[in-house]
Amino acid sequence: QFLALTSRPDDHELLAVMLDIPKRIVKRLSLLQIHELANLFDFIKRDQKVSSFSLTTLRIPSAGILHSPNPKLQEMPFMQFVYVDTFYMSYAVDPRFETLCKLVSYLYSPKTGFNKITADANIDKIRKLDKKTLEAISLNYGLIRKWITERYPLVFPKHSNTRKSHDSSWLDVFDNIVGDDLKDRDKYAEVPVNAVFRFITKKIKEGRK
């Protein structure tokens, strides 16, 4: 039923709205990707949200096996999220293949964890993967991002103009957390993103009292 629904051109817009991505990206989906999304969208019937990656590992030539973030982005370093989310929002506005490769390279890490130098080094290797696989990963992240925004509504207000100032706003958040403690800047960058979101939520609530 889902396949029949999303295969109609008129429903591209509906799927784009549900995923919060441009309709032109949805139109490029293959039937296989639609099928995978049907599995992901099974949460509609269960009234649940997608909070984990379907593709948990990527085998990259000369780079080994890379791993997706944990479900609910648990233990994902805040700075990794800043990079990933910035690339994702940029790709949603201007879907360049280079941006897509950066998104996936920063999203998937070795077993040892995220490292910016490693992520940058893997971009060229990610380029060799099938573009449809990379786009499916981007779509999956979009679903997880939707789950995150609903979990932390004060951090992600629905009517904010996030597309225009998204990258700078995350850097502002990071700078506010670090404050004058510049010597420990790297330590703050490693704080789990969910802990940062809880901290921001707490501060917003305190500011409203």
Tell me the role of every PLM-derived stretch:
Residues Q1-K209:
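An amphipathic, hydrophobic-aromatic interaction surface with interspersed Lys/Arg
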